[in-house]
């Protein structure tokens, strides 16, 4: 994997920085593990915009990822590493001894030809998946389940990981990259090691068109709108917002907490915020 600064042949390429990985597969993905997906452009089933700044972008198939890793005791060989346009992490195509192929999130350090295992008897090695009750305290883990059998939900993006801090009864404490400490049931599964493609954060898009390829539309400032469109809008000429920053619906932004999921608050031992 290499960081490549593009030759400045145009203003759009002057600031562009790419992450090049020559180990990735250059052919087509495994057809049996592809699914179609249509662009929603941020609209819900009524056609109303529920998520702004989405639309357009290149069409691509969804790669069906195995987030459960439930084929216990069956060794799997890494056939190849692939790029996935749906996520920041790379993915690995693994071939199980019974002939089945699956995609998984590619862990850091896992190479083509390496053998992976899952289950409570799997060795503590990068890429292997075990129940948290069988993982030693202090181990770096990723792809962590929040409910047993539901599939990995935490620490799945490029370069992320968590640390297993302690086990108390039927729960374990896990520290995430954000600093948050959460309780997780010991029957939940996690994968040893970190997620690969850790240099993803070093890339520079370089130009607005590259974001349009990814389906990201422009973000218009509130002060550039009319009063009917945003609380910051209006005024003669260039004017300040005239109030503390808020969203288009009047909710304070820039640090204002909006989390209201009281049902899972008991699972958070320490919040990521300092105060």
Swiss-Prot record:
PROSITE patterns: RIBOSOMAL_L2 (PS00467)
Recorded GO MF terms: rRNA binding; structural constituent of ribosome; transferase activity
GO biological process: cytoplasmic translation
SMART domains attached to this UniProt entry: Ribosomal_L2 (SM01383), Ribosomal_L2_C (SM01382)
Compositional bias segments (type: Polar residues): 38-53
Assigned GO CC terms: large ribosomal subunit
Domain of life: Bacteria
Region (Disordered): 38-59, 224-257
Keywords: Ribonucleoprotein, Ribosomal protein, RNA-binding, rRNA-binding
Subunit structure: Part of the 50S ribosomal subunit. Forms a bridge to the 30S subunit in the 70S ribosome.
Family statement drawn from the similarity comment of this UniProt entry: Belongs to the universal ribosomal protein uL2 family.
Alphabetized PANTHER family for the sequence: LARGE RIBOSOMAL SUBUNIT PROTEIN UL2M (PTHR13691:SF5), RIBOSOMAL PROTEIN L2 (PTHR13691)
Role of this protein: One of the primary rRNA binding proteins. Required for association of the 30S and 50S subunits to form the 70S ribosome, for tRNA binding and peptide bond formation. It has been suggested to have peptidyltransferase activity; this is somewhat controversial. Makes several contacts with the 16S rRNA in the 70S ribosome.
Name of the molecule in the record: Large ribosomal subunit protein uL2
Naturally occurring in which organism (per UniProt): Burkholderia multivorans (strain ATCC 17616 / 249)
Taxon lineage: Bacteria, Pseudomonadati, Pseudomonadota, Betaproteobacteria, Burkholderiales
């Amino acid at each position: 994997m290499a960081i490549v600064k593009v030759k400045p042949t145009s203003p759009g390429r002057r600031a562009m920085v790419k992450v090049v990985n020559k180990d990735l597969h250059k052919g087509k993905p495994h057809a049996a593990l592809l699914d179609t997906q249509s662009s929603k452009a941020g609209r819900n089933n009524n056609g109303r915009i529920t998520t702004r700044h989405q639309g357009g972008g290149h069409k691509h198939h969804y790669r069906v990822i195995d987030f459960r890793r439930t084929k216990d005791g069956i060794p799997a060989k890494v056939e190849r590493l692939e790029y996935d346009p749906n996520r920041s992490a790379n993915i690995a195509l693994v071939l199980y001894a019974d002939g089945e192929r699956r995609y998984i999130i590619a862990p850091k350090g896992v190479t083509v030809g390496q053998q992976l295992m899952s289950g409570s008897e799997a060795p503590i090695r990068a890429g292997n998946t075990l129940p948290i009750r069988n993982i030693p305290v202090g181990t770096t883990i990723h792809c962590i389940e929040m409910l047993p059998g539901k599939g990995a939900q935490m620490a799945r993006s490029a370069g992320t990981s968590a640390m297993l801090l302690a086990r108390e009864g039927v729960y374990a404490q896990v520290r995430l990259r954000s600093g948050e400490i959460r309780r997780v049931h010991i029957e939940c599964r996690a994968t040893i090691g970190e997620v690969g493609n850790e240099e993803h954060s070093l890339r520079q898009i370089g130009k607005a068109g590259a974001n349009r390829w990814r389906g990201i539309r422009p973000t218009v400032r509130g002060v550039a709108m009319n009063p009917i469109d945003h609380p910051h809008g209006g005024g003669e000429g260039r004017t300040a917002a005239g109030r503390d920053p808020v969203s288009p619906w009047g909710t304070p932004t820039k640090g204002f907490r909006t989390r209201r999921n009281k049902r899972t608050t008991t699972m958070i031992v320490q919040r990521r915020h300092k105060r």
